[in-house]
Amino acid sequence: MKLSCTLTQWALYVCPAVLLATQMLLAASSETLKCEGLVSTEQGSCQAAAEEDEGDEDDGDMTQSSEAGFQFKGYTFSKPFHLSVSYDWLILQGPATLIFEGDTLVLHCRAWQDWPLTQVIFYREGSALGPPGPKSEFSITMVQKSDGGHYHCSGIFRSPGPGSREAASPVAITVQELFAAPVLKALPSSEPQEGGSVTLSCQTKLALQRSASRLLFSFYKDGRSLSVRGVSSELKIPKASEEHSGSYWCEAVTEDRQISKQSPQLEIWVQALQKPTASETPPTEALGPLPPPPASSAEQPRFSSPDPHLHHQMQLLLKQIQDVRALLGHLVMELRDLSVYLKPGTTKVADK
């Protein structure tokens, strides 16, 4: 087994290194371990290595990082990995580094002493992934989280092999999440007052190992797009109105458009401004004393001229009064005549 690690220039410290190798080797086989990592001087661009979380103060010059391994006296060491040596006829070699959504997954079915194989079959969770064939390599171009599981392979050795089908031990393949499904939040509230401003924030984060990648964001309302994809994870509504009420969601996608995820819907309800009621109306100031009536000028007449219509009505009323008086006079005369006949003496004479 060979170990190669080449440094191109002298440096005071080394950036986080990655030791690449297959996780399982066949006994008596040859394998090269490659140490990959940028090398820079103290003024270089790899300052992140020195800024990792520090360990206990008692460790002196040693600091630890869950991602980069550890540092000692200014040097950064790769994170260790487990290497297995197998004496089986077949082994399935998986990737040495973490596999994320969107990556290409490559599996190798290797035989003892690299003897040629035929009728090779790859399996996932015990189910064949295809018919037998001569290829000892299986790949998934754009892996998803659902592609994780236990894989193994089987094949038949050509001469001088045993001639029977052999199977490799299962290997667990875990696909890491590149970024979580975004969550849409409304700031300061999902129930803003009419006329206020609202900021929609599409919140998610890339995995630390892929933090150099970028995500593009877009926003939607009631099935229609509100913005084109861009690097900004926020959408601002400067002046909210009742028309802005509805169901919103956002989408985060990688720059190569291979991985996209949507957020759950968020209901935005814009509260209309309430007009003040009579009880809420502020009291009016007390009115001062009324001004005195204006003094009449000498030119203004004291009485206005009578109304012609009123004069006509008065004439009719006087005429009716006179008619009533005449009628009353006739009634008085009639009553006098009747009183003569009603006297007692007059009645007796009339009876004789």
Curated annotation (Swiss-Prot):
Q: Which residues form the signal peptide?
A: 1-30
Where exactly are the transmembrane stretches of this chain? none
Q: Which cysteines are joined by disulfide bonds?
A: C109-C153, C202-C250
Tell me, which GO biological process terms does this entry list? Answer: cell differentiation
Composition bias of kind Acidic residues appears in 50-61
Task: Please report the stretch or stretches of sequence annotated as the Ig-like C2-type domain.
Answer: 80-169, 182-260
Establish whether keyword ATP-binding is in the entry: no
Entry-linked SUPFAM superfamilies: Immunoglobulin (SSF48726)
- Give the subcellular location: Cytoplasm
Please give the name of this protein: Fc receptor-like A
Query: From what organism does this protein derive?
Result: Mus musculus (Mouse)
